[in-house]
Design a protein with these regions (language model features):
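ER/Golgi luminal nucleotide-sugar-dependent glycosyltransferases, focusing on the catalytic module
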Residues: 1-160
Length: 160
């Protein structure tokens, strides 16, 4: 994906002045590209094997779940409560039905238009705006999780 970096930088560099926190637009677009590709691989597998998953989970490999979570199927997209920077919505983990997760995983396609339309950009505010535009309802279950790279055992509830 290193070959994509210069192209992506051309697409989004004019919006770098809008960045909040330590966000990086190239890293953000790369994250959503990888999310899209993972979902495409899942769909390819489903077609090849003749199966359809009822529930799709998107997470990161550096998340430590401190307690088991109950993945309940719903018409809403489940995004763990907390880790909401700048009044955005947590982008660490989400789960839901095929339709909601398909939409979630396709944020990449809207990335440039979203970054052009937003006054301030970080991953969480972009995700929140995208879900609002796509009319995706969310549930916010409490999930006790830690990021391994932070090397701490504290759960953050960055919500008011």
């Amino acid at each position: 994906e290193a070959g994509f970096e210069s192209k992506w930088k051309q697409l989004v560099s004019h919006n770098e002045y809008k960045l909040e926190t330590n966000a990086n637009l190239v890293s953000m677009i790369s994250m959503w590209y990888k999310t899209l590709r993972a979902n495409q691989l899942k769909k390819k597998y489903e077609n090849l094997m003749g199966v359809k998953y009822d529930l799709i989970l998107k997470t990161r490999p550096d998340i430590i779940l401190e307690e088991p979570i109950e993945l309940i199927q719903s018409d809403s997209l489940a995004i763990p409560f907390g880790w909401d920077w700048s009044e955005g919505i947590n982008d660490l983990m989400a789960w839901g039905n095929q339709s909601n997760m398909e939409t979630y995983c396709e944020l990449f396609y809207s990335f440039v238009s979203l970054s052009n339309s937003m006054d301030k950009i970080n991953p969480e505010t972009m995700l929140k705006e995208y879900l609002k535009i796509k009319n995706i309802k969310t549930e916010r279950p409490k999930v006790d999780l830690t990021l391994r790279d932070m090397n701490i055992k504290t759960t953050y509830w960055f919500c008011k």
